[in-house]
């Protein structure tokens, strides 16, 4: 049965065979920090003169607080101390926010026009796939997912993706200016800056990335020799003309298969911290008619924007509105007894003991089984932004191994420890009602070409 799905995935993406023991699933922000130990980068550079470090982040997020301390100003001392030949700091800038639009859109929400959103952490032959950034809360009180892959081939593939996007990004270099850094477009970058010529930038990006996304043809793939396969899935819609991204087509392949008779009585769990799945993803989930299914989202009190000032402070209410609309769709399809929406809350954000929820992904369990055989982990939130404006990286695990399936089931369960079911009555409560100003703000963002 899994072969029906993998045969279609083989047409879309490279495939890597791994042993189940090569995949480790981390549970908590603290465990993520202890595994990554990002604070040791400087120490490692000092101890090993042969070590080289390459960091790719987003230009809009990474410079937002300038001239106050920001990602760019915090990282650039590494370049100053160890030199450009050993430390490379790159920041990707979307081609969708330029000129007058960039000047008028507030910095706090300008990421709604596109980000470098991939979360990849590679050291030697190990790779961590996650949805987590490297800010303090992701190491302390922000729940996410973290999978460690001990595979040289898989790590090398994502390193090639990383380097290709680096060459389509600005370099961050030391400067005596107040900000402490300068953002430069290197002459050896293969194309022009996205701020100067977005169209030519896209043409070069397509030439650089398209072949990497589709390294192996179906004819080159032999029957797998292990119980576990990993498919790298990438969504580079803002860069590719035409769009040959692989994440959305793969998700479409899996969810469409679930709606066929062969997969009747399958089940799934879907989660996204920011609950704004596209209409297509919502339809695919609902049309799968699962035996049972769970959707996990952040409650407003576990949303990172809760209590923010200005337009961003409206986002928790906007996501509540979208959750209510999802339940309306579930009800109209007659699936209320099969699909449960749960909201995750652990205290209240910005209060002592309060956490935020940022996990995202999919688990699929085959008919008449109790543990998932398929899991998708990575950066995507499955939103309009993910599929039109952001750069996303994910790993799709397909396994027949019972021990790995058990670990995936445990992950699926522990993410629900702080989640409770909500129904349509919940959204009728006074504190959950959404004002007209929120609806207008949602409409305005769309009109200006952005997305939640």
Question: Which residues make up each language-model segment?
Answer:
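A generic local structural motif
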Residues: 107, 255-256
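Short, contiguous, pocket-lining structural segments
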Residues: 154, 242-254, 260, 273, ...
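Active-site cores of enzymes that catalyze phosphoryl transfer or operate on phosphate-rich substrates
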Residues: 1-30, 184-254
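Extended catalytic-interface subdomain
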Residues: 103-110, 123, 129-130, 157-215
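Short glycine-rich, low-complexity/disordered patches
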Residues: 174-181, 225, 421-429
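PLD/PLD-like phosphodiesterase catalytic module centered on the HKD motif
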Residues: 1-127, 132, 136-141, 146-156, ...
């Amino acid at each position: 049965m899994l072969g029906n799905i993998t045969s279609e995935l083989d047409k879309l993406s490279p495939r890597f065979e791994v042993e189940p023991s090569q995949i480790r699933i981390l549970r908590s922000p603290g465990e993520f920090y202890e595994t990554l130990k990002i604070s040791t980068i400087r120490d490692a550079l000092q101890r090993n003169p042969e070590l080289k470090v390459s960091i790719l982040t987003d230009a809009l997020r990474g410079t937002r607080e300038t001239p106050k301390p920001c990602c760019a100003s915090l990282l650039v001392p590494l370049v100053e101390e160890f030199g450009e030949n050993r430390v490379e700091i790159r920041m990707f800038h979307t081609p969708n926010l330029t000129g007058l639009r960039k000047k008028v859109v507030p910095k706090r929400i300008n990421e709604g026009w596109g980000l470098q959103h991939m979360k990849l952490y590679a050291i030697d032959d190990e790779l961590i796939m996650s949805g987590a950034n490297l800010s303090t809360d992701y190491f302390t009180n922000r729940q996410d997912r973290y999978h460690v892959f001990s595979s040289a081939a898989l790590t090398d593939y994502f390193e090639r993706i990383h380097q290709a996007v680096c060459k389509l990004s600005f370099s961050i270099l030391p400067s005596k200016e107040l900000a402490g850094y300068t953002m430069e477009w290197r002459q050896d970058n293969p194309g022009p800056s996205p701020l100067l010529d977005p169209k030519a930038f896209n043409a070069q990006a397509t030439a650089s990335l398209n072949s990497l996304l589709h390294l192996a043809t179906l004819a080159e793939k032999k029957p797998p020799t292990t119980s576990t396969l990993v498919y790298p899935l990438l969504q580079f819609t803002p860069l590719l003309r035409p769009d040959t991204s692989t994440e959305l087509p793969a998700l479409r392949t899996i969810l469409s298969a679930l709606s066929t008779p062969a997969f009747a009585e399958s089940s799934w769990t879907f989660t996204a911290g920011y609950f704004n799945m596209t209409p297509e993803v919502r339809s695919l989930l609902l049309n799968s008619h699962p035996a049972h299914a769970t959707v996990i989202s952040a409650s407003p009190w576990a949303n990172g924007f809760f209590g923010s000032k200005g337009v961003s402070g409206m986002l928790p209410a906007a996501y509540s509105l979208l959750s209510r609309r999802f339940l309306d769709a579930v009800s109209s399809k007659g699936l209320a007894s099969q699909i449960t929406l749960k909201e995750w809350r652990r205290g209240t954000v910005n209060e002592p003991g309060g956490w935020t929820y940022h996990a995202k992904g999919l688990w699929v369990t085959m008919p008449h089984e109790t543990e998932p055989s398929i899991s998708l982990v990575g950066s995507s939130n499955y939103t309009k932004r993910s599929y039109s404006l952001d750069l996303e990286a994910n790993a799709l695990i397909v396994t027949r191994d019972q021990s790995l399936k058990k670990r995936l089931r445990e992950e699926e369960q522990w993410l629900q420890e702080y989640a409770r079911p909500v129904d349509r009555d919940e959204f009728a409560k006074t504190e959950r009602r959404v004002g007209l100003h929120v609806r207008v703000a949602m409409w305005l963002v769309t009109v200006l070409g952005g997305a939640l």
